[in-house]
Amino acid sequence: MAQIFVLGAGTPTPTPHRFGSAFAVHVGGEYLMFDCGPAATHKLVKAGIFPTQVDYLFFTHHHFDHDVDYPCFLLCRWDQSVGKENTLQVFGPTLTETLTERIIGEQGAFAHDWKARVNHPLSQRVFVNRGGTLPRKPPHVLAKDVGPGPVHRGREWAVNAAPAEHVQPYLDSLAYRLDSAEGSIVFTGDTQPCRSVVDLARGADMMLCMCWDDQERMQANGEAPGQCGTTGAAQMAQEAGVKKLVLVHIGPHLSTHGPMEKGIGDVRRLYSGEIIFADE
């Protein structure tokens, strides 16, 4: 099975143990990231992966808890490079290209940073000492807005996408399936239970699925539309025939003892496979 790192298993609400969404996968000798939420770059390094090792990033959607660390990741990966690394390729729904340009473009929010590092003698010396060769090149990223269907194929893997039902029409959302000889993994992103994600996940070895809260509580407080809770995640996984269900995007209420144990029990009643309540 491909190696999976849960960097962010939380929500927009920070807790001591979870905050935002971000995942890394080591497959076929390559590192991929899915989403880049709060502190994802730091969490990546804590997991033993340096930013320059990641060559592919896939965004499910552009809520801040899934992309707020994107500027940090882009700048850190570029700053720590020596110019011999592979070009970073970034895929995501509408706004992915625009956000990338707004961050590191010639008139981007952080253009002042990379221009100083490209041109100042001190930054040039640090770059050369690291192993780089002058002149130093500005950041270059291949960002692409994508939709449902085939997204990209690596050396030994392929990623396909399907629509996820979250907060349309304000933001487009995608779920991703990663297939390789090492197994099949689905990242639902943020979604309510829906046919498109079930079909994408059909027969997968693992599904990392949003699980915001106890489903009954969500129905009672009006937070069910656009989101998966406990039984929603379980029903999708069971219908898709997923072998292992990893619960992520876990809200603060469900993270507490009592609701956590009840939630896992509710999932177990509907889903017959292995259940993992994710930690970062």
In which residue ranges do the predicted regions lie?
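Binuclear metal-dependent hydrolase catalytic cores
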Residues: 1-185, 264-280
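Cap/insert and terminal regions of metallo-dependent hydrolase folds
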Residues: 173-175, 181-186, 191-280
